Amino acid sequence: MPSEKTFKQRRTFEQRVEDVRLIREQHPTKIPVIIERYKGEKQLPVLDKTKFLVPDHVNMSELIKIIRRRLQLNANQAFFLLVNGHSMVSVSTPISEVYESEKDEDGFLYMVCASQETFGMKLSV
């Protein structure tokens, strides 16, 4: 099975910067987030999309619930959202704060989802 290209591999830096500019212009209260499955992940299903526009008032626990629902995970299935491939942030942190401190130079906030088996490893996005 060929490995899936990441969002950064599919879009040039210039395209991503323009994407963010248009998103922020059209949706000033939304945070542009890219969520991809950790490349070595075996337990979690693949998300049906990678680009999310998250309302800026949402906290991390709400985002986790949304992604769990999209993945159709059971309550007992382990699931972690890692910011920039390595940071776990408090579930009470508003996404707007995470965005300001962790956004990429292209303007997107990158996250990877992983099951417990990858917890604690440095992940590359």
Swiss-Prot record:
Site (described: Cleavage): 120-121
GO molecular function annotation: microtubule binding; phosphatidylethanolamine binding; ubiquitin protein ligase binding
Lipidation (Phosphatidylserine amidated glycine): 120
Post-translational modification: The precursor molecule is cleaved by ATG4 (ATG4A, ATG4B, ATG4C or ATG4D) to expose the glycine at the C-terminus and form the cytosolic form, LC3-I. The processed form is then activated by APG7L/ATG7, transferred to ATG3 and conjugated to phosphatidylethanolamine (PE) phospholipid to form the membrane-bound form, LC3-II. During non-canonical autophagy, the processed form is conjugated to phosphatidylserine (PS) phospholipid. ATG4 proteins also mediate the delipidation of PE-conjugated forms.
Lipidation (Phosphatidylethanolamine amidated glycine): 120
Biological processes annotated in GO: autophagosome assembly; autophagosome maturation; cellular response to nitrogen starvation; mitophagy
Keyword Disulfide bond: no
Membrane topology: Lipid-anchor
GO CC terms in record: autophagosome membrane; cytoplasmic vesicle; endomembrane system; microtubule
Residue ranges the record assigns to the propeptide: 121-125
Domain of life: Eukaryota
Subcellular location: Cytoplasmic vesicle, Autophagosome membrane; Endomembrane system; Cytoplasm, Cytoskeleton
Keywords: Autophagy, Cytoplasm, Cytoplasmic vesicle, Cytoskeleton, Lipoprotein, Membrane, Microtubule, Ubl conjugation pathway
Main location: membrane
Assembly behavior: 3 different light chains, LC1 (a cleavage product of MAP1B), LC2 (a cleavage product of MAP1A) and LC3 (produced by one of the MAP1LC3 genes), can associate with the MAP1A or MAP1B heavy chains.
Protein task: Ubiquitin-like modifier involved in formation of autophagosomal vacuoles (autophagosomes). Plays a role in mitophagy which contributes to regulate mitochondrial quantity and quality by eliminating the mitochondria to a basal level to fulfill cellular energy requirements and preventing excess ROS production.
Family: Belongs to the ATG8 family.
UniProt-recorded name of the protein: Microtubule-associated protein 1 light chain 3 beta 2
Lineage: Eukaryota, Metazoa, Chordata, Craniata, Vertebrata
Gene: MAP1LC3B2
